[in-house]
UniProtKB/Swiss-Prot annotation:
Pfam families: BTB (PF00651). InterPro entries: BTB/POZ_dom (IPR000210), SKP1/BTB/POZ_sf (IPR011333). This is Putative BTB/POZ domain-containing protein L98. Residues 15-85 form the BTB domain. Gene3D superfamilies: Potassium Channel Kv1.1, Chain A. SUPFAM superfamilies: POZ domain, Tricorn protease domain 2. Belongs to the mimivirus BTB/WD family. It comes from the Viruses. It comes from Acanthamoeba polyphaga mimivirus (APMV).
Length: 495
């Protein structure tokens, strides 16, 4: 009978070395074989090339964690250990670095709220860099008392949370750039991109090429999964969820493994267009307009995101090119475009039963240009609209006032909100960065040249949007003059 290599682990058979592993809490002795350790990693090759260790039969090694260190060496003997507990995963990462093994930072660790204090203490001992700060930002719950942190730490954490990139979509390429146009990442494809979206609160982009949907992690620089799907017309995301729509249904996909686990079927027999709004945990699906009783109407359907059932559907009197949901006053904005004109209407409803009011209120009319984009900004209770001819304006729902912010004197192809007051506008050869808190020429704070082949512009979101908003409000309340900033440089981040 043949024996596997694993039978020699911690066995005295042919063992020529005993190592006592020691950390701050425990110690353990294990029998090893120098030739196996020598082949396993550079740490032991360096050790055994020294005279004293090469002739020793017992040595002591102080390691970051005893259990993780032993499990790492078990792998040299063909023994694999699986443990996804956050502390074990981080200890394994630290120990692999200690032994000189190639390893990637475990960026996808999830820490339960009861472990947050222990987790923060662990990171404090481990050290701060971009990876650990992102991990903290990802896992701190919104309810955590941030005022227990020094101000310099809160500011550093906010810089990590507030880092966003523009996503420029070409025919065969997706490029991530900062607001100055500096390229952060470029992803090239063999086939043309049919649709793309950023999965909110993550470092992932979902895109469709021919009959395959893929999710790409731009921080880890790898494909998370790919899924064959020949019928998809639209993909979109909200609150970390991924949705795809075809001719008759909406499908929710797990953005981690690609598994489908929820469907919203439509009785509407034409191509559906999908929008997702998660404030009240429902999605809205609307189809291509058609003639209904001699009038153009569009079917609007509400689906419960938790239960999966239809809440309500109704016919909107008109053609819908875009819509935005507004949780304030429970209303929706519908955009109707014609050949060279565009109109924005507001329709109100009761959220509890999705009871639609019959009135349709005009809030803005573009007499000389189509409306390319409408964006709801919750922090300002306002709707931003961008017209094809370069006009950018806003409608405030609280005052019922519409005003023009600026005219970029360039054709607008697409637009996206980067932060609560910063708007990125895509023109044929330029990206304009606009401050919507300002008007006229003062609103244009930056612009950079891009290829005319760009068809879509998107923005990455914070890895923890709710925490970012909470820290932003907290920083606004901090009196800088009353706080000592002498420790501002204690935390340094590495690129």
């Amino acid at each position: 009978m043949e024996l596997s290599l694993s039978t020699l682990f911690d066995s005295e058979i042919l063992s020529d070395l005993t190592i006592e592993f020691v950390d701050n809490h425990t110690k353990s002795k294990v029998h090893f074989h120098k030739n196996i350790l020598y082949l396993g990693c550079s740490y032991f090759r360096s050790m055994f090339n020294r005279f004293s260790e090469s002739n020793s039969r017992e040595i002591v090694i102080k390691v970051p964690d005893v259990n993780a260190s032993i499990d790492i060496i078990k792998y040299f003997y063909g023994i694999e250990t699986t443990n996804d507990y956050w502390k074990y995963v981080l200890n394994t990462y630290v120990c692999k670095k200690f032994f000189g093994l190639e390893t990637e930072f475990p960026a996808n660790i999830t820490v339960v709220s009861d472990d947050i204090e222990e987790f923060l203490d662990f990171i404090d001992k481990m050290g701060y860099d971009d990876n650990t700060l992102k991990l903290i930002a990802k896992n701190i719950p919104e309810s955590y008392n941030l005022q227990t942190f020094p101000k310099y730490f809160i500011k550093t954490l906010f810089r990590v949370l507030d880092t966003k990139y523009l996503i420029l979509v070409f025919g065969h390429e997706i490029i991530l750039v900062d607001i100055n146009g500096t390229t952060y990442k470029s992803i090239k494809f063999d086939t043309s991109i049919k649709g793309a979206c950023h999965i909110q609160n993550t470092n992932k982009i979902a895109y469709r090429t021919d009959n395959i949907i893929r999710v790409y992690d731009f921080e880890e620089n790898k494909i998370v999964f790919e899924k064959k799907n020949s019928y998809t017309h639209r993909i979109c995301s909200a609150n970390g969820k991924l949705f795809i729509g075809d001719n008759s249904r909406v499908e929710e996909i797990n953005p981690i493994n690609g598994e489908s686990y929820r469907f919203f079927r439509s009785t509407y027999d034409e191509k559906i267009i999908l929008e997702v709004f998660y404030d009240n945990e429902f999605i809205i699906v609307f189809g291509q307009p058609h003639v209904h009783s001699l009038r153009i109407k569009t079917l609007i359907c509400f689906y419960d995101m938790k239960m999966g059932g239809k809440i309500r559907s109704f016919y909107y009197d008109g053609n819908v090119d875009m819509l935005e949901y507004c949780p304030v006053n429970k209303c929706m904005f519908f955009c109707e475009n014609h050949k060279k004109t565009g109109k924005i209407y507001r329709v109100c409803f009761y959220d509890s039963s999705i009871k639609i009011f019959t009135r349709k209120e005009l809030v803005y009319e573009s007499k000389y240009s189509k409306i390319i984009k409408i964006i709801w900004i919750s922090t300002k209770c306002s709707l931003i609209f961008c017209c094809e001819n370069g006009t950018i304006g806003t409608y405030c729902i609280m005052t019922n006032e519409t005003k023009i912010l600026t005219d970029i004197n360039d054709k607008i192809k697409d637009a996206v909100l980067i932060k609560h007051n910063i708007l990125a506008i895509l023109s044929p050869n330029t990206v304009h960065i606009i401050d919507i808190n300002k008007c006229g020429d003062n609103a244009n704070i930056n612009k950079f040249n891009v290829s005319s082949d760009i068809v879509k512009i998107m923005s990455t979101s914070s890895i923890n949007t709710k925490l970012a908003n909470k820290i932003s409000d907290l920083l606004d309340d901090i009196d800088d003059e009353s706080d000592d900033d002498s420790d501002d440089d204690i935390i340094t981040t590495k690129n």
